[in-house]
């Protein structure tokens, strides 16, 4: 049945194919790793991921379907700002941004880092273009019962004039962050509309 070294030849050929397959797989993995490294070192801050678009639209009170999120999100203008002593300066990317401002259909949303219950997170706050009302707010990276209370509130003198329990550090942090976003968005809004 296995005359003239058929089995030996078959095994030799199989071994050669395995070596070639493993070698080509290693080189393709190296190529993929190189591409991932290049892509991760150059984040495209001009595009917003769909998850962030959801947070922004929720803060703005924009009703949309998940299916339409990406196409609607292409119309959101995004601006990144650093801040020092209450003065905001435009920066080119999300890295080191203290405030990110989204503008869509004459409504603003601000995003800023926040620490809630010891967790680092981001808060999104939607603000009407006349800076008289907070539309809604939400968190990314933490959960808090406070989020439901910071919506449909009036703004006066660039801040919310509400009181929170002084013993509740999360409530104080939340209010400070919301007021920081309101003040920041109002200060930089002339730069966005010109």
Swiss-Prot record:
What's the source species for this entry? Borreliella burgdorferi (strain N40)
Q: Where is the lipid attached (S-diacylglycerol cysteine)?
A: 22
Q: What is its main location?
A: membrane
Designated name of the protein: Outer surface 22 kDa lipoprotein
Where, per UniProt, does this protein localize?
Cell outer membrane
Signal peptide interval: 1-21
Lipid-substituted positions (N-palmitoyl cysteine): 22
Membrane topology summary: Lipid-anchor
GO CC annotations on file:
cell outer membrane
Alphabetized, the UniProt keywords read: Cell outer membrane, Lipoprotein, Membrane, Palmitate, Signal
């Amino acid at each position: 049945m296995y005359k003239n070294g058929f089995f030996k030849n078959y095994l030799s050929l199989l071994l050669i194919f395995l070596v070639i397959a493993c070698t080509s797989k290693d080189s393709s993995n190296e190529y993929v790793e190189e591409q991932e490294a290049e892509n991760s070192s150059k984040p495209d801050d001009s595009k917003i991921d769909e998850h962030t678009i959801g947070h922004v639209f929720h803060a703005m009170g924009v009703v949309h379907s998940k299916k339409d999120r990406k196409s609607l999100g292409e119309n959101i203008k995004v601006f990144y700002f650093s801040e020092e002593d209450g003065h905001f300066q435009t920066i080119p990317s999300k890295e080191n941004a203290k405030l990110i401002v989204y503008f869509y259909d004459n409504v603003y949303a601000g995003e800023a880092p926040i620490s809630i219950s010891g967790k680092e997170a981001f808060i999104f706050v939607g603000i009407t273009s006349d800076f008289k009302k907070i539309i809604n707010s939400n968190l990314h990276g933490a959960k808090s019962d406070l989020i439901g209370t910071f919506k449909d509130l009036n703004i006066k003198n660039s801040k919310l004039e509400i009181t929170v329990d002084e013993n509740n550090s999360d409530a104080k942090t939340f209010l400070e962050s919301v007021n920081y976003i309101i003040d920041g968005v109002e200060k930089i809004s002339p730069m966005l509309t010109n």
